[in-house]
Amino acid sequence: MSDHDTPMESIQNGENSDERLNAIASFFGCSLEQVKSFDGDVVKHLNDKLLQFNELKSENLKVTVSFDELKASSLKKIDGLKTEMENVIRENDKIRKERNDTFVKFESVENEKMKLSSELEFVKRKLDDLTEEKKETQSNQQRTLKILDERLKEIELVRVENNRSNSECKKLRSTIMDLETKQQGYITNDLNSRTELERKTQELTLLQSNNDWLEKELRSKNEQYLSYRQKTDKVILDIRNELNRLRNDFQMERTNNDVLKQKNNELSKSLQEKLLEIKGLSDSLNSEKQEFSAEMSLKQRLVDLLESQLNAVKEELNSIRELNTAKVIADDSKKQTPENEDLLKELQLTKEKLAQCEKECLRLSSITDEADEDNENLSAKSSSDFIFLKKQLIKERRTKEHLQNQIETFIVELEHKVPIINSFKERTDMLENELNNAALLLEHTSNEKNAKVKELNAKNQKLVECENDLQTLTKQRLDLCRQIQYLLITNSVSNDSKGPLRKEEIQFIQNIMQEDDSTITESDSQKVVTERLVEFKNIIQLQEKNAELLKVVRNLADKLESKEKKSKQSLQKIESETVNEAKEAIITLKSEKMDLESRIEELQKELEELKTSVPNEDASYSNVTIKQLTETKRDLESQVQDLQTRISQITRESTENMSLLNKEIQDLYDSKSDISIKLGKEKSSRILAEERFKLLSNTLDLTKAENDQLRKRFDYLQNTILKQDSKTHETLNEYVSCKSKLSIVETELLNLKEEQKLRVHLEKNLKQELNKLSPEKDSLRIMVTQLQTLQKEREDLLEETRKSCQKKIDELEDALSELKKETSQKDHHIKQLEEDNNSNIEWYQNKIEALKKDYESVITSVDSKQTDIEKLQYKVKSLEKEIEEDKIRLHTYNVMDETINDDSLRKELEKSKINLTDAYSQIKEYKDLYETTSQSLQQTNSKLDESFKDFTNQIKNLTDEKTSLEDKISLLKEQMFNLNNELDLQKKGMEKEKADFKKRISILQNNNKEVEAVKSEYESKLSKIQNDLDQQTIYANTAQNNYEQELQKHADVSKTISELREQLHTYKGQVKTLNLSRDQLENALKENEKSWSSQKESLLEQLDLSNSRIEDLSSQNKLLYDQIQIYTAADKEVNNSTNGPGLNNILITLRRERDILDTKVTVAERDAKMLRQKISLMDVELQDARTKLDNSRVEKENHSSIIQQHDDIMEKLNQLNLLRESNITLRNELENNNNKKKELQSELDKLKQNVAPIESELTALKYSMQEKEQELKLAKEEVHRWKKRSQDILEKHEQLSSSDYEKLESEIENLKEELENKERQGAEAEEKFNRLRRQAQERLKTSKLSQDSLTEQVNSLRDAKNVLENSLSEANARIEELQNAKVAQGNNQLEAIRKLQEDAEKASRELQAKLEESTTSYESTINGLNEEITTLKEEIEKQRQIQQQLQATSANEQNDLSNIVESMKKSFEEDKIKFIKEKTQEVNEKILEAQERLNQPSNINMEEIKKKWESEHEQEVSQKIREAEEALKKRIRLPTEEKINKIIERKKEELEKEFEEKVEERIKSMEQSGEIDVVLRKQLEAKVQEKQKELENEYNKKLQEELKDVPHSSHISDDERDKLRAEIESRLREEFNNELQAIKKKSFDEGKQQAMMKTTLLERKLAKMESQLSETKQSAESPPKSVNNVQNPLLGLPRKIEENSNSPFNPLLSGEKLLKLNSKSSSGGFNPFTSPSPNKHLQNDNDKRESLANKTDPPTHLEPSFNIPASRGLISSSSTLSTDTNDEELTSNNPAQKDSSNRNVQSEEDTEKKKEGEPVKRGEAIEEQTKSNKRPIDEVGELKNDEDDTTENINESKKIKTEDEEEKETDKVNDENSI
């Protein structure tokens, strides 16, 4: 190492000497040659002197700069002090006039005092830190002190000047003290004013007592409000219970309704079936009648013409009848389907019932006969009655028959019009939906419109208010200007025409006066006011005008009192009128009640009369109406009682409230009169105080600083108020949102009501339409027969479609079950993949930890080398720029390489994306098909249940909406309750703050005593300040204005408090409105329930009608049966004799029955009309009752307006109380602040004195810091200059010498070492981060513990506070008791009570202060912890982003195998570069070792080492090849032929489903980064290791060759050795670069060749495979099948690859090129030959592979054969899927290439023949069997789903091939191309 260091030192000395000479020459202005002529010692001395001179220069600069800065700072301080003095004098006058307001703000003084003390401590700490830094700088500056001795004298002069300035400052301070002594003299005059103040405090105590009384009343009102709330809560609970009960009833009714509906449906079905039977019978009857009439006519003719042939005709007639009966029976048998058997049974049952009825009729007739026989002896009257009854019976029978016929016709017409009615229903439903949508839109738009109108109105109102405010402000401004004008006049007269204002200000006021246009618009009264009150000559005149003002105000107050009395009287009148109106309303309601009862009795009587005439069917309806009336009656009675009770309560409350309010108003008027008297007194005293105020203007010097502090406090209070306002605004916004939601709900309810009304209306319309459709039934009878035939055909078609649909459904269910099984299997597979991923992640984590350990060990080695780096840093600075240029060049080259690779990656990514989109589109198509089929099925099923479901859904929606509304109401109530609680808490907080303020005032009062001692000193200083009194008058005016402004601010605070209270009252009103809305909703619910009950009754009526129809039909059937029997009997008689009159009798009876039925129908219609009229009358009466109820509700709302007025009055009273409290507090604080003012001023002076030396030290330290910064700047400038100089030298010489190059290399090495140091620092930073994280966690734990302890403390303090509050409340209760006995007891007891109260308040204040301190500390700790947490979270998020980027890069790497191959190439190239860099370092070390051992002969044999490495490498490669072969043998197992044939039998639907499932699996596996990632990473690591070994071998070879040429002697110099090393490294770099470029070119050429060969082969194969399609479809000799539902895994591989008996076979070595082609086709997602569906990405289960490996040996015609020639030329690279014909063409086209390849690689064939013998034989067998068994294309497309799994495994085995072999392949390909 010593030999190596000597040349480096010599080089450095040479460089330093050149630099020295240049510097000396430039300094003295000589040439370099002259300087070089000097001796070395002289040059050294000159250089030392030059350096000293430069140092002196820099120090001189520093000193001058520091001196200038000191000067500037001292001047600034002097100016600042002067300005401060002037400001103090000015603000002295302001503070005197603002005294009343400043006392309120004295509380902030203490806080700021604490702040100042904390700042002082902070400054002291800073001073300590700065002193430490100063010590450090002094240790560094001890060398420069010798040179700075001369300059110290100048600094001392500066210090003298500084001291002089300090002495002047002290003099100024002494003058201030004199002024303060004078001020004390003036304070004595204040004592007189204090006596008056004490008198006023006594008056204030009386006001406080009044305030306490008012507070007591407030509490009582609050208690009443709480009791009212409790009552309302109870009422709400009762209502909820009733709601639950009603819900249960509703559910019960719904269940009953459902049961009735089911029964109704069953009955309607049975009715329809019976009607069909009746139709068939009637048709047969009609046909028989027609035949009978024809036969009778024929018989009559035959009797007249051929009496002799009667017997023959009779025989013929009998035969014809038999034929007719047979025909009828045949027709009936044809009609009787399996479905009509049930109908026949029911007919038989009805016949049996008819028979029973006939028996009963016979029995009754027998009874009547007996009665007739018994009653023969009766008189003629009884017989006449009996005859009359018989006639009525006959009439009734006829009417019955007529009705039955009409009902039959009506039913038939209804059956025909069922589809039309259904279509009408559908249309009505559609129209209803459209109407609903339109109504919703209209409501939405109307709501929006209303909202916007409201907003517009509000904004207009605001604009009007703003305009009014502007007008008032302009008036006030004008009045002020006039007053100022007159004041100026008076001042100018008194001060010899020299006023206090400047000319500009006077002009400004005059401009305002000129611009005034209000005189035109002003009224006469306003002009008079301005003349009398604004314009004045003297102060005496102003006082007189003020007295006039007082008189006017008092007169106005009297008028107000009189008006208020009148308003009270009017209110009493209104109350009495309301009570009378309520009584009258009650009386009217009672009378109406009586009327209703009488009407109900009349209706009951009418109902009893109707019962006799009307059948039993109408009884149920009358009962229902009676029940409804009774219920309404009860409701009305209950409502009347409620109204009576409420009215009585309201009257009581109103009278009580009025009495209380009158008392309060009288008390207020009394207090107001007292206050007005006191105001007059105070104004007179104020005039005297103002005269004295001029003398006390100098006292404002002390109060200036206090004023600033108080202003800060005031700003802080304003901020808190603003925050409270923001909170209130938030609550208001929430309330508004709730209100909007409520309005939306109400609109929805209204919509529902309207929908219900529409539905009822539509039902009525439908009924009317049904009545209108009845006349059309005759026209539609003809179509019945045709429709019946069509119906039968349709039923047959429906049955067929149902059967087909059921078959399809069964098939789909089977397919679904299969899909579910497959999904379960694939879920299991996904879980396995997740477990594998977790294991991989753990492995990576372990690996990262190991790498970290290695990294730490490397860092330790780097630390040892850092000492050498520090020596060479000086050289690095000069050569940094050149290194950066080299880096830029390298970066450009790297960017070029990356862009080439990025383009290829992007293209392949785009292809994969296109394939995925195609796959997704196909999936969507299949899903759409499936959805359409399922929708069609659902539609057929849903149409049957729609009507029933709609009805139930509507009921459910209404109930859900009802529940949601109730929930919303409850939520709103809770929110209101929370808001009230928050307001109470805020009030409590304000009271606490008030107590704190009082406490601070007491402290200030104590401090004020100390200030009085200082007053005596100010008296001596008054003589000097008398000259400044004229100036101070101006300041007094400004201070007065400020005082007025602050008064206005306090008024704003009181306004905000009043606004809060107003909001409270508004909230109460809103609660009431919510209660009203709740009542409305309840009423709406009741109305809905009534409507539902009416609907239910209508349904029951319909049921009764249907039952009556059934009974009529049964009776009609009986009649028909009787007629049939009569007809059969008549036929028998006709056979014997021709009895024509019998038929005529039947017709007559039928006509009579028809007439009877007609009369009955008319009677029934009349009865119905009568009933309808009665119902309409009842509805009118109900509507009248409802209107009366609405009127009563309106009256109730009027009462609520009175309550609101009462609340407004209470709010005004509260505002007055607040004003009184504020006045009291302000006066108390005035007294306290006067005392504390002086103490604070003295403390401020002391603090200023303490701060002054600290500030001087700070400035000195700042100067030292600036000097250091200047030194740094100089150093940077020198570095920049040297860099420029080095650049100039380089530009001149243009070329670098070998020595410069060596220097650059050495500096590069140094930079590398610096990089390593930086990496080590990064590791240390990570460790620090981990430590910080642990510390943060520990702190979090400690903070949580502290938080828990703090919360406990807070709770304990709160408990103590509550105890104190309880004690306070007890004390207040005692005070109230004592106040009741105020007259009896004396003033002594009042004082004792006050003491108690003050003690309690003090205790509460102390607790609150403790609480605030604890909360502040708690909040500070929490904030600190939150900041630490946020920093930690940010760091964690950064790490997560890095991890996500890594994951994204890993996910992008998994897209395609082709991308992975290219990325591997990139990584290999990068590894080469890294390896070169690492090897250069190793070579440097080895060269050094070799140089040391050059004297001795080298014992190491490099060739032996090389052979060992090669043998190890070959062994590793052979092991990997064997492992890959074994894996292939396991996985390349094909199923048997019998099981492969099953795949063709499968449908395309199954394939499509499997495809979709596999696509989903692939997406999941891509997300979870499955097995491919692990395999590829292993392959990459293996490749990198092999490449490193190869590069090491090559590098060592070249080093040995170079070292062999070096002579074995020790006479070689160090320079020569360095040159040798540099030359070797440069050569190696050039060679490596050339190799990299050659590899890039070769890989590019290979890709081109592969693409060309692939396209040509694919075109040929497509043509031939299409020709083979027809043959393969016909000949199904060897159809492929799946093995146990596991598809063939090898169909994605090529079937054959250029077989030749001469060429050796190695499937693993040749498989890589095959993979490069196959990866593009398979990974792209589509089979280019057959299947329309895209192939899946490479993914499969390990279980399936193992099962395939254990199966029987595959058929040879499907086993893949590999044939890659030894040359690895074009054929091996372009090998793809091919058939036998393609193989023959390839072998014929490329014989020359194969021969050349066989010649070139003879040696490799000998070594690999043993391994490849078996695969070659297998390949020959494949050739023979593929000729006989050719595969169809469909088979390939179907089996392509699983072939990618095996290609993945083959890729794993084939990627073992090293980069060396690829390079050899490319060389041989180039040779063959050249041949």
UniProtKB/Swiss-Prot annotation:
One GO term (biological process): negative regulation of protein import into nucleus during spindle assembly checkpoint
Compartments it resides in: Nucleus; Nucleus, Nuclear pore complex
Basic and acidic residues bias: start-end ranges: 1738-1748, 1807-1840, 1865-1875
InterPro entries in the record: Leu-rich_rpt (IPR001611), TPR/MLP1 (IPR012929)
Biased composition (Polar residues): 1667-1688, 1728-1737, 1787-1801
A Pfam family recorded for this sequence: TPR_MLP1_2
Protein name, as recorded: Protein MLP1
Organism: Saccharomyces cerevisiae (strain ATCC 204508 / S288c) (Baker's yeast)
Gene: MLP1
